[in-house]
Amino acid sequence: MEVFQDYAYYYNIFYQDKDYRREAEQINSLLRQYGKNIGKIMDFGCGTGKHDLELVRMDYQCEGIDASPYMIEEAKKNAEKEGAKIKFSVADIKSFEPSGKYDAVLSLFHVMSYQNTNRDVLSAMTSARKSLNENGIFLFDVWYGPGVLSDKPVVRVKEVEDEERTLTRIARPVMDEKENVVSVRYDVLVVDKKTNIAQMFCEIHNMRYFFKPELDLMLQEAGFELIANMDCNTLAETSFSSWTSYFIAKAV
């Protein structure tokens, strides 16, 4: 079962309430705090490109890659609609070979949590290191282990709509505490408002949750120095209530 196939088409609808502007402002603040002269950015796992559109408005030069051709198709449509000059390409972050160097690599909305094995995580980190100038910044977010174990995932239902359709998504998580992975089954019901015709599809997203010591070690192996991590929502120090965390590393 391919991840982000049917789901990609409806991705923008499901996350229409996501505050990309606020998140981009957070990223801008962190890049200015921990980086120097950040101008050129590569986005690993760019999805539909919404973060990049916001960052371009802040005068960054952005490019994005994603393993899902369906996501890249939507990203290109979004950029064209906004008149933004952003290069979006289909590529796997685990094997990406950059044609140039960047001042920062971003990997947002838990893309690194989709890397379930140590090998995959290290491969993605190595790709990021290859992509960076000396002292470049690698900024990513993940599901944060202490928070996930303190407030374990439960079944959730989300209902959204646009002018043409209504969508209902049921997320059913199953935890594998030996592998630190949560397998989330998404069952999605789409109903056309005009015809009342319904269709259903399912995707399974396997999400790894991480702990700081293991990421610190893997970053070192990939050629980075971990310089900061914090709660994604508050930018305060992480705690047992932090479900997601930013990690910021410098290329060394």
What are these regions, as identified by a protein language model?
Residues 122-134:
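A short glycine-rich, Lys/Arg-flanked "PGG" loop and its adjoining helix->strand segment in the class I
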Residues 49-95:
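Class I SAM-dependent methyltransferase SAM/SAH-binding core
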Residues 142-216:
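SAM-dependent methyltransferase
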Residues 1-45, 50:
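Conserved class I S-adenosyl-L-methionine
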Residues 97-104:
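A short acidic, Gly/Pro-enriched loop at the edge of an enzyme's catalytic core
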